[in-house]
Amino acid sequence: MELKQSLSVHLEAEKPLRRYGAVEETAWKAEGLGSQLDIISMAETSMMPEEIELEMAKIQRLREVLVRRESELRFMMDDIQLCKDIMDLKQELQNLVAIPEKEKTKLQKQREDELIQKIHRLVQKRDFLVDDAEVERLREQEEDKEMADFLRIKLKPLDKVTKTSASSRAEKKAEPPPSKPTVAKTGLALIKDCCGTTQCNIM
């Protein structure tokens, strides 16, 4: 029984941590509860909070663009259908109008009045649709202005941070590196250097 428990604890300790994309499961050991635990953030250490917020704003902007495009396509489909219905009714009305008034039957006169009323209602409906599209366009312009102001405010501190980090890197490059023997890096070391402090271009 003790052997099984010892084996179970050993296997549990060697069990690899799960990964969810760039997020690694936090290591949790029962025997270390009394000591200080190293908590690793779920976010990539190469991104600052301002950069994360800016990236989220860009994603939100992309989502809004897709929603707008869907709305535009719906407006277009409704407008095409309304125009088609109006043209069909007008064609039928023209055929009735071409008949001399004295030769028209009572049903034909009633149908002519019905067509005029239907065409009038459809024209009004299309006018409402055009007005709604114009209101939507003005609202989108206001949203674009607000988003542009937001991005401009958020990009200013990031530009300062980028310039500061670039100048610090330039100062570091100016210092001569200490001489040390050349050692060939393994694949794991190359990956670590590639994805350490800056975002990997390959990823």
From Swiss-Prot:
InterPro entries referenced in this protein's UniProt entry, alphabetically: bMERB_dom (IPR022735), C16orf45-like (IPR040127)
SMART domains, A to Z: DUF3585 (SM01203)
Chain residue ranges for the region called Disordered: 161-184
Pfam families registered for this protein in UniProt: bMERB_dom
One Gene Ontology term, aspect cellular component: microtubule cytoskeleton
GO annotation terms (biological process): cell motility involved in cerebral cortex radial glia guided migration; microtubule depolymerization; negative regulation of cell motility involved in cerebral cortex radial glia guided migration; negative regulation of microtubule depolymerization
Source organism superkingdom: Eukaryota
Domain bMERB: 3-149
Name of the protein: bMERB domain-containing protein 1
Name of the coding gene: Bmerb1
